[in-house]
Structures are given as structure tokens and as C-alpha cells.
Design a protein with these regions (language model features):
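Hydrophobic core of transmembrane alpha-helices in multi-pass small-molecule transporters
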Residues: 47, 67-69, 139-143, 152-173, ...
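C-terminal ends and interior cores of transmembrane alpha-helices
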Residues: 137-150, 236, 334-348
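Extracytoplasmic gate region of multi-pass secondary transporters
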Residues: 48, 52-58, 76-87, 260-318, ...
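Conserved MFS/SLC helix-loop-helix module at the cytosolic interface between two early adjacent transmembrane helices
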Residues: 114-154, 320
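Intracellular juxtamembrane helix-capping segments at the cytosolic ends
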Residues: 87, 160, 167-183, 189-190, ...
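C-terminal transmembrane helical hairpin of 12-TM major facilitator-type secondary transporters
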Residues: 291-293, 297, 303-309, 320-374, ...
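Interfacial helix-cap and linker-helix signal at transmembrane-aqueous boundaries
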Residues: 63-64, 87-92, 122-123, 203-216, ...
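Intracellular terminal tails of multi-pass secondary transporters
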Residues: 1-45, 50, 217-252, 377, ...
């Protein structure tokens, strides 16, 4: 069987402590057709889910307030800092501390990840469409609530909790859809869907300032609420999952996955990637100011970073389908670290920093472009929802604490970003090394399945034949290649 003929495979699953090996028939994924409609809908949802912080940031240009605020809220991106400056300058929430404001931004991200098991359970009980519509309702309510906020706890409820929960239901409900519709083009489809986040950030960063200037902040939020409701509801209604066709487990917390070392490797890869990604995303515009650039130039750098992500994710997906998803994911993550160490470290001019924002943006968000395809490659489509649900829970820690870590590094170095850049670069490289180890495991698994099927390893589809170690039927005398050899050998996985 070739890599692109994912029609049949062997899958071993655990039930009540017993391992059962069964043959999985092809689920008839069309590799096109209505699947592209679902990809477009997922990209649109991602644009709305992740545009929020970009929108928050282009509200006003109060540089003297922003300069003070940035010293206290380094963890939030400069865009969000400007939004907070709007509240402070207008004395809307007197007595509210800088830390209170800073916590709101991180709260929404952590709540989106924490709610993932609930969203997975909702999908299993009521279906994907219901899960997405719950997210639409929560996100719409959050925008409307923010438009009427007059006390700090209103912001915690609207921008922190409510928006975070809505983001979680929308993201969890849509993140695995693209992978269900494709086999040979799975990574390309997921890359296009993931590109919506970067494209949405770019579009809304350009549109938000005009809305605030012409209609005011409250009505800007209300207009966003209306648009979000209409657009996301439309996407929720046209998205179709294939959970029944593939027999998706949809378990919120399948603890048995933690017994698999390859799954633990994926968790470490995501953990380290997010430590680096959040620091890069939130610090690049601020870094521009520390090397003598204006606030406007810093905002441009942030917008270009989003553009780079939108441009980079589809090509990463496309080449992943040709050269291997694990190969591309580990290589691109390594490049993200390398670019940070050799370009960002020495970027002191606007032109060089824009160049880094473009090339760094291409690879910085590799995890989001490959999360579903790589997890499918390792765990299989059946366990994909459960594996992703656990992944989002694990990512609560790095997305919550990477900001304070970066803040402490910058403060310890007297305001210099050298330490933060080193931290970012080496976390990316460490993540790439861990995933390269998972890749070596996968090569051994492919060798074993090839031996069972009586084929060469290059003829085995690494997705269709998702099996755990120790499956029966291995020919007598068969041994996998040594692990160290698998680390350096070439195999499309």
C-alpha cells in the first residue's frame, strides 16, 4: 500500500485493559468535494476565534499611557496593551490594578483550553453543530457584554470567561473537521484552515481602528457581535463532521492515552512549542520599541507577523503531505528556533525586524498547522478527538505561565530581550528534538506494520496503519531498526 492509498489499515485499541487488534476499513474520505467547504468554514471560524486580541489593540494611540502599561503587562501583546490604555486613560474602571487588566487577556486563553473536555463531551452527546452554536452564542454575548462594561469584574466575565469559553467551543468543535475529510491532502487542508487565524488578525487589525474612530468603542463591539453571530452561525450550519463514518471515540478524558509514550512525546512537543510561541507573539511589537522604533512601527511588525502566519501555514500543510507530516513539523519547528537565534537576536532596524516577522511568522505557529494531522498520524482518527482534548488541557500551563516567565527574564536582564529571545529559540529547538524522537518511534511502528503486511516500509501508509507496539502477527525473527539509526534515517512519516 502506498502512502497515499489510505484505504485499509490495522489499528489496535485498548478496552478495559485488554488490547484488541482490528482491521480498519477506509472511511471513504473524499479528499475534496464538500470537504473544501468545511475547510473554508473552519478557516473563517479560526479568523473570528483568534482575531480578538488583534482587534483589542488598535483602539487608540495613547503612547505615554501605553509606555507605562507595557512595563507592567509585558505578557500581553502590544495591541492588547493599547486597548487597556484606552480604559485607563478614560478612567472607566478606577482603582483597577495593572495586574487585573493583564490577567483578563491570559484568562480567556486558559479558559478556552480548560473547557475543551466539556466541548468534546458536548460533541459526543449533541453533535458538532450544537457545540459550535454554543460557542457562537457565548462569543456574541461576550462582545455585547464588553460593550456595556462599567466595572472591572464586567471585563472578567465578558472578555475573560465568556469569550474564552466561546473560543474553546468553537475551536474544539472545528479543529478536527478538516482531518476527517482528507487523507492525501490532510495537512494542506488543515494548514488552510489554520491560516484563517493569521489572516483574521491581519484584517481586523486594519479595520478596528476605523471603527473605533468613527462609531466609538461600545458600538464597535456591538457591530462585531452582530458580524460574529451571522458569520459563525453560517459556518456552524454548513460544517459537517464524519464522526459516525470513522467511529470517532469522542471521549473527554481518555487516561489510557497517557500510557502510550508516543502520545506523551506529542504532549511535550506542544508544551515546549507554546512556551516559545506565546513569548514570541506577545513580545515582538514590544521589542521593536526597545530598539528605538515607534509604536506604529511596532504595530506594523505585529501585523506582518500575522501575515507571515497566514502565508506560511498552507505551504507547510501542502509539503507535509508530500514529505511527511512529522518530518515537516519537526523541521519547521527547528527553523522557528533557528530564526529566533540568528535573525531576531540581531534585528535592530525596522527592515530586518519586518523580515524576521515574515520568515518567523511562516514557521512560528507550526504547531497549530500540524496539531491535528500529526496527532492523526500518531494516534489515528478514532482517538483524534480524545487526544486533542487532552492536548488542549496540557497546553493550559504553557499558555498561562509563559507570559510571567518571559516577563521575569526581561526584568532580570534590565529590560533587555536577549534572554527572552534565547528562551524562545531554545524552546522551539527542544520541541523539534522531542518530535524528532516521536518520528523515530513512528518509523519503527511503520517497519513493524510493514513486516506484518509482508511489505516494505515505504509501501505502508503511516496513517492508515495506526497500531500500538506489540501487535500480533509479527514475523519470526523480525526486529526494528535500532532507535539511534531511526533518528538519522530518511522515511516519509
Amino acid at each position: 500500500m502506498s502512502r497515499h492509498e489510505g484505504s485499509q489499515g490495522v489499528e489496535k485499541r485498548c478496552h478495559g485493559g485488554e488490547e484488541q487488534v482490528r482491521e480498519t476499513k477506509g472511511d471513504g474520505a473524499p479528499n475534496g468535494g464538500y470537504g473544501w467547504v468545511c475547510v473554508a468554514a473552519c478557516a473563517t471560524i479560526n479568523a473570528w476565534v483568534f482575531h480578538f486580541f488583534i482587534f483589542l489593540g488598535v483602539m487608540v494611540g495613547l503612547e505615554e499611557v501605553v509606555a507605562d502599561l507595557r512595563r507592567h503587562t509585558w505578557g500581553l501583546n502590544s495591541a492588547y496593551a493599547v486597548f487597556l490604555a484606552y480604559y485607563l486613560a478614560n478612567d472607566i474602571f478606577p482603582g483597577a490594578s495593572h495586574l487585573s487588566y493583564a490577567f483578563i487577556g491570559g484568562l480567556s486563553i486558559s479558559q478556552a483550553l480548560i473547557v475543551s473536555p466539556v466541548a468534546t463531551l458536548t460533541t459526543r452527546l449533541f453533535g458538532t453543530r450544537t457545540t459550535l452554536l454554543i460557542g457562537v452564542a457565548l462569543e456574541t454575548i461576550s462582545f455585547i457584554g464588553a460593550s456595556f462594561a462599567s466595572q472591572i469584574w464586567h471585563l472578567f466575565l465578558s472578555q475573560g470567561l465568556c469569550f474564552g469559553y466561546g473560543m474553546g467551543f468553537l475551536f474544539v468543535g472545528s479543529v478536527g473537521i478538516s482531518a476527517q475529510w482528507f487523507t492525501t491532502r490532510r495537512s494542506l487542508a488543515n494548514g488552510i484552515a489554520a491560516a484563517g487565524s493569521g489572516l483574521g488578525g491581519l484584517i481586523y487589525s486594519l479595520a478596528a481602528q476605523a471603527m473605533i474612530r468613527n462609531i466609538g468603542l461600545p458600538w464597535a463591539f456591538r457591530i462585531l457581535a452582530i458580524i460574529a453571530f451571522v458569520v459563525n452561525t453560517t459556518c456552524a450550519l454548513i460544517i459537517r463532521d464524519r464522526n459516525k463514518q470513522i467511529g470517532s471515540s469522542q471521549l473527554s478524558f481518555d487516561y489510557r492515552l497517557f500510557k502510550k509514550p508516543q502520545f506523551l512525546g506529542l504532549m511535550v512537543f506542544g508544551f515546549l512549542s507554546m512556551l516559545a510561541y506565546v513569548v514570541l507573539l506577545f513580545s515582538l511589537p514590544n521589542y521593536a520599541r526597545t530598539v528605538g522604533m515607534t509604536a506604529q512601527q511596532g504595530s506594523i511588525v505585529g501585523a506582518v507577523l500575522n501575515l507571515g502566519q497566514a502565508m506560511g501555514r498552507p505551504p507547510i500543510g501542502y509539503f507535509s503531505d508530500s514529505f511527511g507530516r512529522l518530518n515537516m513539523a519537526s523541521t519547521m519547528t527547528f527553523l522557528a528556533g533557528l530564526f529566533s537565534l540568528v535573525i531576531w537576536m540581531f534585528a535592530k532596524s525596522f527592515g530586518v525586524l519586518v523580515f524576521f516577522a515574515v520568515v518567523g511568522g511562516w514557521v512560528a505557529g507550526t504547531f497549530w498547522a500540524v496539531a491535528a494531522p500529526v496527532t492523526t498520524e500518531i494516534m489515528g482518527l478514532v482517538d483524534l478527538p480524545s487526544a486533542l482534548s487532552l492536548t488542549w488541557l496540557v497546553l493550559v500551563l504553557p499558555t498561562t505561565f509563559s507570559e510571567p516567565i518571559g516577563l521575569e527574564i526581561v526584568a532580570y536582564n534590565g529590560g533587555s530581550y536577549t534572554g527572552a529571545i534565547l528562551f524562545t529559540g531554545w524552546m522551539y529547538i527542544a520541541a523539534a528534538c522531542v518530535l524528532w524522537g516521536v518520528r523515530a518511534w513512528k518509523i519503527g511502528d511503520v517497519e513493524e506494520q510493514a513486516a506484518i503486511a509482508g511489505k516494505r516500509a515505504s509501501e505502508v501508509d503511516p496513517v492508515a496503519m495506526v497500531a500500538s507496539q506489540g501487535s500480533g502477527g509479527v514475523p519470526e525473527g523480525f526486529t526494528k531498526s535500532p532507535f539511534l539509526k531511526r533518528l538519522v534515517m530518511w522515511q516519509i512519516v
